[in-house]
């Protein structure tokens, strides 16, 4: 007699909405159902909100693409923006486009289809790309803080230190470090065994929901993941905090209030972006597992994958006279042509 949920020919059981593989050990107690496909179910419990959320996230994604691409083009076209800070900002804008594009299009498809099935390989690729681009984002924000430190605390040496070769080396180092960290964490995460339920109540394949599906011995992989994660978020935060500590000390020592206000204004945009980005990452990844709700995690994930990449061009342009002036001249040229 055939068992419900099994294919009589292949004897492959069905778990959730995906095929799984049954591995038979020496004894019956060692039987495991290993997940070979994941099913994303974020927001599916509210089907009436699917269309409004789809339109909202689509609008946010388009603004993200236009805003960050516009920032890259503006920096490329205006020679006054060919300085280290804007060189780093152009790479940050590019990373924001990539970072958002890894998750948001799939989230849009998930809302339309009331869920999304991902193969094991697709899930691993998405996790790798998200980790890669996110790590580079962290490193670039740290480099921008270091750039501000040099500009404020070492103004006479700034031009000598931040040469074109130095800028390229720093950015290349950020890309290489992000690649290495992403590779190690992805390999560590996907050498875990995932068994039982295959539903991920999240908007993409991220580490916290994946670890909930892990079974068997996972201590070694989790230690490796945590160790390499320390070299991304906490390490970047240390560079940022130390840089701004020196900046604050330098500002306090300035003789006039006008000088202090002018100098601090050059850092406000970056401080705002750092606070938003790292604030959401800390809430998501560096807090304990107790008391976490999937609804809160989904909202926070939308913030750092969709909202913050959309806001960054606004943050760096609204309080920045050089960017606003470059944008005004660009628009005037467009009108005249």
Per-region residue spans from a language model:
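Transmembrane helical core of 7TM receptor-like proteins
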Residues: 1-337
């Amino acid at each position: 007699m055939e068992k419900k949920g099994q294919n009589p020919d292949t004897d492959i059981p069905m778990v959730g909405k995906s095929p799984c593989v049954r591995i038979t050990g020496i004894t019956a107690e060692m039987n495991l159902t290993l997940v070979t496909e994941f099913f994303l179910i974020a927001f599916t419990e509210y089907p009436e909100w699917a269309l409004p959320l789809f339109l909202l996230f689509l609008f946010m994604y388009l603004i993200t693409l236009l805003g960050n691409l516009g920032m890259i083009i503006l920096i490329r076209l205006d020679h006054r923006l060919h300085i280290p800070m804007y060189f780093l900002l152009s790479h940050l804008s590019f990373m924001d486009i990539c970072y958002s594009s890894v998750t948001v299009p799939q989230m849009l498809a998930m809302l339309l289809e009331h869920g999304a099935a991902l193969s094991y390989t697709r899930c691993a690729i998405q996790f790798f790309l998200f980790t890669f681009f996110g790590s580079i984002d962290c490193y670039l924000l740290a480099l921008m803080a270091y750039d501000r430190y040099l500009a404020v605390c070492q103004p006479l040496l700034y031009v000598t230190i931040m040469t074109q070769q130095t800028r390229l080396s720093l950015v290349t180092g950020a890309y290489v470090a992000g690649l290495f960290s992403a590779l190690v964490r992805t390999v560590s995460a996907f050498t875990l065994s995932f068994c039982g339920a295959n539903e991920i109540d999240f908007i993409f394949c991220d580490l916290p929901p994946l670890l909930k599906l892990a079974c068997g011995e996972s201590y070694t992989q989790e230690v490796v993941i945590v160790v390499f994660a320390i070299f991304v978020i906490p390490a970047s935060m240390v560079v940022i905090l130390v840089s701004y500590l020196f900046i604050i000390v330098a500002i306090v020592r300035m003789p006039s209030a006008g000088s202090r206000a002018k100098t601090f204004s050059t850092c406000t945009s970056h401080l705002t972006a750092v606070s938003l980005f790292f604030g959401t990452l800390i809430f998501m990844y560096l807090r304990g597992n107790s008391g976490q709700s999937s609804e809160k995690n989904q909202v926070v994930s939308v913030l750092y994958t969709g909202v913050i990449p959309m806001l960054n061009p606004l943050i760096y342009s609204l309080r920045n006279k050089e960017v606003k002036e470059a944008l005004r001249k660009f628009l005037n040229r467009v009108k005249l042509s």
